[in-house]
Amino acid sequence: MNRRYVLSMGVSLVSLAVMVASSSQSLAQTQPASGEIALETVTVEGQGGSATGPVNGYVPNRTTTGSKTDTPIEEIPQSVSVIGREEIEDRQAQKVDEALRYTAGVFAQPYGLDSDTDWFFIRGFDAGQTGVFLNNLPLYQYGFGGFYIDPFVLERIEVLKGPSAALYGGSSIGGIVNLVSKRPVTEPLRYVETGVNSWGNGYAAFDFGGALDKDKIWSYRLTGKVSGGGWETEIAEDFRGVIAPAFTFRPNAGTELTVLASYQHMDLMHTGGFLPYVGTVVPAPFGRISRRFYYSEPDIDLYRREQAMIGYEFEHAVNDVWTLRQNFRYAHVDSKERGPYPFGYLGGAPVGPDFLLFRVGFNHHTVVNTLSLDNQAEAKFGTGPLNHTLLLGLDYKYYDIDHIQAAGGGTPISPVNPIYGVLQGPTVPYLDQDLTMSQLGFYAQDQIRYSGWIATLNGRYDHVSTKSTDKVGAANFSDEAGEFSGRLGLGYEFENGMTPYAAVSRSFNPVIGSDFFGQSFAPETGQQYEVGLKYRPTFIDALITASLFDLTRQNVNTTDPEHSFFEVQLGEVRSRGFELEAQANITAGLKAIAAFTAYDIEITEDSNPLLIGNRPNVVPEILASGWLDYTVQDGPFKGLGFGAGVRYVGFSYADNENTLKVPAATVFDAGIRYTRDNFTVALNVNNLFDNEYVSACDTQFTCNYGAGRVATLKAGYKW
């Protein structure tokens, strides 16, 4: 149950450092001529180094996402995308979902530039609730009980497309996003950055690291930022900060312990979204609602979050065959939200002279405590002509959420002449729930090589337990379920760099809740067939991935036709498609990325037979993007860099009946920067021509504008 669904349900029930922050220049790149600040050589400590460390330009080589081992991307029998620090910096991505806008198979920011949440769909399915991982450990979300990670503290953002339960247990059927933290370094690293955007939001950030002793047994990384100011809406306040310390203890070449921690504070007001179809997608009698329209109440508007995490990654090489690993994290979040949300026009249609929008009061208080533990034993050995990398694992996930949600009457507001300060009605709790979920899983993986052949075999069994207690009359429930997941992949690596592959996988995803009769929902299940080609040319530093897939998601919750406000599990959705992605370091100064996605997404089963054969709402079936970046390498303009990109989002629907169409949109981005010695300055403009478009609609009452033009100017210095 994601937060937008919670809000819609609440509305339906009623209506029926001392510095300011953003991204920083890459601090550990190996190509100073690219226009990034030329830093000293930085050695990244951690698991495998190259699989979690800096990406060379735009072209990744290795990953742990999709295997939990340090593996070349070509050997993963699924499509994997990696966005490195340099790409994040070149585009000045301020949020994780913003960084994903140029990734094949990902529809990012469907609800516009949400200031407190990252939204993305992978292969047609929402992955925000059960598809977010940090360092290969889950960041599960239920309702408003999720986590927010600022990209400034990340080294990489990686996307595994398609089912992943064979490795990770219950997770999004469409794919996952694995966020990779910055790790401690052994060489001195000192960097500061500051800037401001055209909305009046300023920031500053720092990134320090190095060895703590002459033998480099101890090393550290300290990353932080703080930001504050305006947002796109006419009335806005935004203040947030994060600090992320990390320490590594490496007493010898075979033993390593890294402690990773972070603390984040957010205090802000609500931004756009939740606007009606008439007045955004199509004009109302007064025209269209402004993108800058603020729909809440400044005197009571509140969004506040306190978030903290601490964990560790331990690795010990027992001998030349066996390596043991244990990864652990505890995370806590306490969030509060208050303010009215619009839900269509008062009376159902825009009526002059004020064209009032109906508003519903809403507030929640959510506290989450969660921990994850992953134990791994990896063995590398041979059996005759076969070379094996065997992984055995036992992991545990615990998630507890204690939350209260309330809704009530709100006063209407005019989108053409808003008047603020009107007293709002009281809210009444409709949910006061304490919910726990635990998952215990055992998994095994064997990566087998024979000559050019690469086989990957996965098997996993999970036991999932959920329990819910509600204090305001909603049904209590508890449930236990066991599920098996698996993956079988086969590829062949040719000497010219081409690796065709094929894979079949089975996945599951726990569903929390119960139907009208108190029967707990069964887990969603999914099956995928995928074939593709990964090509790493021998004559250029590039990676090209093409994939075809057929993915079916079963046990999808749909509206109960006999009991209002309840759901039944009668749904099935099939997503078939083609994805093409290319990343290239063409020359020392020229880099490029390109992505194309074409889907055929169809509702194949539903409690409403009229929906069968239709396309689900929100998701477009065509996505395309490209970004080109060039930096002058010598001469009087050495260090001057330019970047330009284009994003195309195909049309979608605002309803599953497919009667309300949301038009396609094309958006251009650009950037320019200059680096000299230890100093750099950069200007990026997103939505260069200020195209006004609707990114997606959940319903006819909840449409969302894409972000308007915003320019960000930053300056960075290293010493």
Which ranges hold each PLM region?
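Extracytoplasmic beta-strand/coil segments of soluble accessory domains associated
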Residues: 59-81, 85, 94-137, 155
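Short acidic/polar hinge/loop motifs at secondary-structure boundaries
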Residues: 137-161, 179-181, 520
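Outer-membrane beta-barrel translocator/receptor signature
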Residues: 152-155, 166-245, 251-255, 308, ...
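Acidic/polar loop-and-plug regions of large Gram-negative outer-membrane beta-barrel proteins
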Residues: 227-231, 244-317, 334-368, 411-439, ...
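Structural signature of Gram-negative outer-membrane beta-barrels, strongest in the C-terminal barrel
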Residues: 248-252, 368, 387-391, 395-399, ...
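Membrane-embedded beta-barrel scaffold of Gram-negative outer-membrane proteins
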Residues: 313-329, 333-339, 500, 523-585, ...
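Gram-negative outer-membrane beta-barrel transporters
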Residues: 452, 550, 569-656, 692, ...
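C-terminal beta-signal and adjacent terminal beta-strands/loops
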Residues: 592, 647-655, 661, 673-719
